[in-house]
Amino acid sequence: MYSVSIIGASGYTGAQLVQLVLQHPKLELAGTYVSENSNDANKSIAELHGNLAHVNATLTPISDTALSEMANGVDFIFLATPHEASHDWMPILSSGKAKVLDLSGAFRIKDTAVFEQFYGFPHTQTQSLAQAVYGLAEWHEAQIASADVIAVPGCYPTASLSALKPLAHNGLLDESVRPVINAVSGVSGAGRKASLTTSFFEVSLQAYGVLGHRHTPEIEAYLGTPVIFTPHLGNFKRGILATVTVKVKAGTTSAQLEKAYTDAYADKPIVRLRKSFPKIDDVAHTPFVDLHWKLDEASGYAVVTAAIDNVMKGAASQAIQCLNIMTKQPIETGLVL
């Protein structure tokens, strides 16, 4: 058994991690933590998340001393914390035997100037940044297997890259035309903190972060080409539906697209290649990525749709996939019945 601590267990992603760790046959939950100034410090996790009413776990406030002890006291640490906290704590947490899986955006972007532009604070943890491996589980398995620090991808990048990487990997994209990604996320993507934008009476379908969302440089860095990315807030709880329009190279056929996706995901049990365009209900509360595509050979434009649960594959279950890779278990262990 591998011991696991979760920092930031009060939020949606942290609570989902608690549930996944508890149901995993090879993991034991060593502790659940929040920051010292959290309003949820010393509360029961059952008090915050009714689906965990059966779980006897307290949200312990974490100190710098406790961080250092944790680094040598458990096998794995999940960070479901704000970007700034992950940035500041990583050198301590990664200094011991524990392997760290960070679900914030603090270590996804290697270019520190780009990071500061999109995240609003300077990145000074250069050693940890160099150490971090991007945890897109289906595409970076070899690097993940030997990593000590994992930067778990963002929710929108997970959906977008899952849709686009088979085309890029096979050289099928017309690089003179940027892929256009329109993606809609449920309000859980904004976290538990109350805000007018995500309140019941105010939430509606709306674009946000237009031509400036912080997931744009993340997608571009791991796709290898610029994109036009427009996220939308939807009036539902969970899930992301990303619809991607791309121009493929002249002469590309539907058979080539079929082969690209089949070859990429034939042995990837978390990715489901669908016969029709997926919907969010197909993936809500599951770890799956559902994909479908259609090509107009006359114009050279293809539309690819990816559906994921933003809290699962977009965060917590992908972190578990990475842990499974790191411990040489089947990637779907603890995730798929």
Curated annotation (Swiss-Prot):
E.C. no: 1.2.1.38
The protein's enzyme class: oxidoreductase
GO cellular component: cytoplasm
Localization annotation: Cytoplasm
Protein name as it appears in the record: N-acetyl-gamma-glutamyl-phosphate reductase
Pathway in which the depicted protein is active: Amino-acid biosynthesis; L-arginine biosynthesis; N(2)-acetyl-L-ornithine from L-glutamate: step 3/4
One Gene Ontology term from the biological process aspect of the record: L-arginine biosynthetic process
Catalytic activities: N-acetyl-L-glutamate 5-semialdehyde + phosphate + NADP(+) = N-acetyl-L-glutamyl 5-phosphate + NADPH + H(+)
GO molecular function: N-acetyl-gamma-glutamyl-phosphate reductase activity; NAD binding; NADP+ binding
Subcellular location, principal: cytoplasm
InterPro entries, per database record: AGPR_AS, AGPR_type-1, NAD(P)-bd_dom_sf, NAGSA_dehydrogenase, Semialdehyde_DH_NAD-bd
Recorded family membership: Belongs to the NAGSA dehydrogenase family. Type 1 subfamily.
Function description: Catalyzes the NADPH-dependent reduction of N-acetyl-5-glutamyl phosphate to yield N-acetyl-L-glutamate 5-semialdehyde.
Keywords of this entry: Amino-acid biosynthesis, Arginine biosynthesis, Cytoplasm, NADP, Oxidoreductase
PROSITE patterns: ARGC (PS01224)
Residues of the active site: C155
Pfam families cross-referenced by the UniProt entry: Semialdhyde_dh (PF01118), Semialdhyde_dhC_1 (PF22698)
